[in-house]
Every structure is written in C-alpha cells, then in structure tokens.
C-alpha cells in the first residue's frame, strides 16, 4: 500500500444479490474494465453465504469456480479484490443459509431471507460452537481454492456482522475473528480484516476494535452521515474521517474506510424512503470533500458504496421492495452513465496521493464505551473543533 487506495463496493446492476445464481461474467468483466479506466485500485465484492455453503459441511464447487473466475477478471484489469465472506447482512436484509437459523431466535430489526423466502427466524450464535466450526470449514476451503491469488488484497470476514447477531462478549467476538483470520491465512497465505460499521461505535454491541482487530493487518470501517444521528447534515464531511480516526484510536491499527457513500435523491426530492439523500452534484461534492480529508489524516484508502445503481426491474424484489433507497447509491446510474462522484474519484486517482502518517489517538476505548451514548457526540464535537478552519 504505497499510496492511498481507491475502490468501489460491487454488486452487478442486472442481478444485485442474485449474482451467483444469475452469473454473468461478461457483465462483471465490463464493470471491472470501467473501474480500472476510472483509476480505481480495489473492488470489494460479496459471497452470498447460502450460494457458497448450502450445508455446514459442503461448499458448492460451481460457486467456487465462479469466484475464482471473478478474481481472474479483476487481476486481468489490474484491480485488487477484497472478497467479503459470510454475507450475511446486506442492504437491510440478513441473507442466510437455512442451516444457520435458530428456531428459538426470531428475526428483529432486519428481515431474514433464506432460500429465496422470508423467514421469521434469526441466525444462531455464529461466533462459537457448531456455526463457528462450519465457518472455519468454509474459510479453509475457499482459502485453499484461492491460495496466493495475485488479485486478493485481503479477505473480509463479513459485512457489518453485528447486524446479524450481537456477540455475547468482546472476547467471543475476538475469538471468532482470530479463528477465521488464522484459518484464512493458513490456507491462502493472505490476511483478513472485517467490515466494522458506525453502529459498532455508536452503541455497545460487545465489539471492541482493540480485540476484534488484533489479528488483522489493518481495520476497516463503514460510515454514512445519513445514518449517523450525530451528523450535522446528510453531507457532513467530517463524519467519515471521525469514524476512521476513532477506529484507529481503539484498534491501534491503520484503517481502510471500505464503505462510504450516499443515497441519491429522486428528481425534486430531499428524502427517499424517509431517509436523507443527496442529488447528483451534491454527491460528487461530498466525495470531493471526504477523500482528501481521509488521505491527509492517514487512512489507507476509501471505497465508495457502491459501483452502480441497480436495474429498476429489481425494485419489487428484496431488498429493494422495502428499501427503495438502496437502488440508487451508484457511481454509475442504471443506464451506465457516470455520476459526478465517478469523476471525483477519477480526478483523485490521477493525483496518485501517497499514504500519510496515522494520527494520534483521539479517545480512550474503555472510557468511550463506558460513556455511551453521550460519549459519541461529545468526542465528535471535540473532533470538529480540532479540525475547524
């Protein structure tokens, strides 16, 4: 990582979360070529759990072949890849294999979809026991399948996994992370990180960056002003840098910001599905404000959520049927045209900015979590004062 990395989170526009069952390598190849043309370095993509591991002791061979073909196309376009495993939570839905469900645990905040239908059950305790052993089996299998593949930057253990289930303790979360990271490294000779998100800092979900990231070469974080109650606006340019610095303070690791972005407003609207949004020009200005802040303050890189809007024909299917704002986060519109945010990333890529030094800690982890919920807005207010001009 000699320079600040730029990337995009990726599901194809035509299939979204159905990519592995409606697989179109030609579409993926075209998208990767366009990413490379914009100067992006990394594509973060997602392995829908039930598509890859239909049973706890079985991995789908055809899915593995498709996975390797995606890695090969990334490498052909000189992109690095961050494959995200055990997905898991995505766009307001928990997509889960039937064998992971706990019939004594009902789904709560997020819908569970398993086998293409909504289930009333939530996931069992995947941080330990049989479910952890099944994940370790998958990690060893896929690691061996892609051992030392030149495209892989790092494995990602999961996307905002505390949205699936909160661990019983920070120690349990750290054990889960350490076991999977170990298995992935032993089988693939490639390190792993994990998709933490702003809610892991906004409430006590029994996740501590200091322990869960101990085995990672660097931490990753996701954050959105539109989903952050302490933000001053939907385009507050300090929210993402603040979450980055807070994660670095607690983990004592370098941090890559692997998700930031904004839902795009329909014409003439200021809300979409009741959530704040930005128009195209505002979204581009937001990216132009955040990218240099992250780079100057020592982040390893920044990935936009997400590469493309989805085909409007998917609007009646999950997750978009209940979360229509998720249709329009893209660097590209559904017709393939570029939004201003794509140009913002391309311009930043041409500057080839180097990595800056990581900043000193801005808060103490133990004091911060003990002081929640008040500590978050308090620390953010001090952070804004320090970076006011």
Region spans (language model):
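Generic structural signal for well-ordered alpha-helical scaffold segments
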Residues: 143-144, 244, 291
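Active-site clefts of carbohydrate-active enzymes
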Residues: 12, 46, 159-170, 221-232, ...
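Active-site mouth of glycoside hydrolases
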Residues: 1-215, 250, 311-314
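Amphipathic alpha-helical segments in well-structured domains
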Residues: 64-67, 173-177, 240, 280-287, ...
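Aromatic-rich peripheral "rim/lid" segments of glycoside hydrolase catalytic domains that contact
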Residues: 105-118, 305-389
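Glycoside hydrolase catalytic-domain groove-lining segments
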Residues: 171-271, 300
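Hydrophobic, well-ordered secondary-structure elements that form the walls
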Residues: 294, 302, 345
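Extracellular serine-dependent O-acyl
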Residues: 150, 299-310
């Amino acid at each position: 990582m000699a320079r600040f990395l730029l990337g995009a989170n990726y599901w194809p526009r035509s299939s979204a979360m159905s990519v592995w069952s409606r697989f179109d390598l030609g579409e993926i190849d075209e998208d990767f070529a366009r990413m490379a043309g914009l100067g992006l370095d990394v594509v973060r993509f997602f392995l829908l759990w039930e598509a890859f591991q239909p049973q706890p002791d079985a991995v789908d061979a055809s899915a593995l072949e498709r996975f390797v073909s995606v890695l090969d196309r990334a490498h052909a376009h000189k992109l690095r890849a961050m494959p995200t495993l055990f997905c898991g939570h995505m766009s307001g839905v928990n997509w889960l294999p039937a064998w992971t469900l706990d019939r004594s645990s009902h789904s709560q905040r997020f819908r569970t979809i398993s086998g293409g239908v909504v289930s009333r059950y939530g996931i069992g305790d995947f941080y330990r026991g049989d479910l952890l052993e099944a994940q370790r089996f998958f990690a060893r299998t896929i690691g061996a399948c892609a051992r030392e593949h030149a495209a892989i930057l790092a494995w990602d253990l999961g996307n905002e996994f505390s949205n699936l289930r909160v661990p019983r303790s920070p120690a349990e979360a750290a054990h889960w992370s350490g076991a999977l990271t170990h298995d992935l490294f032993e089988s693939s000779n490639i390190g792993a990180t994990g998709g933490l998100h702003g809610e892991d800092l906004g409430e006590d979900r029994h996740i501590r960056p200091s322990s869960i990231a101990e085995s990672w070469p660097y931490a990753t974080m996701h954050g959105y002003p539109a989903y952050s109650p302490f933000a001053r606006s939907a385009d507050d340019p300090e929210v993402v840098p603040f979450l980055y610095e807070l994660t670095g303070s607690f983990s004592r690791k370098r941090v890559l910001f692997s998700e930031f972005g904004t839902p795009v407003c329909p014409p003439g609207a200021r809300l979409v599905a009741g959530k704040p949004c930005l128009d195209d020009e505002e979204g581009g200005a937001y990216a132009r404000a955040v990218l240099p802040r992250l780079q100057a303050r020592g982040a390893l890189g920044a990935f936009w959520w997400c590469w493309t809007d989805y085909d409007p024909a998917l609007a009646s299917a999950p997750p978009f049927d209940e979360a229509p704002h998720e249709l329009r986060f893209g660097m590209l519109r559904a017709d393939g045209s570029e939004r201003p945010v794509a140009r913002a990333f391309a311009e930043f890529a041409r500057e080839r900015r180097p990595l800056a030094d990581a900043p000193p800690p801005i808060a103490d982890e133990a004091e911060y979590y003990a002081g929640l919920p008040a500590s978050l807005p308090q620390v953010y207010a001090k952070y804004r004062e320090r970076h006011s001009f």
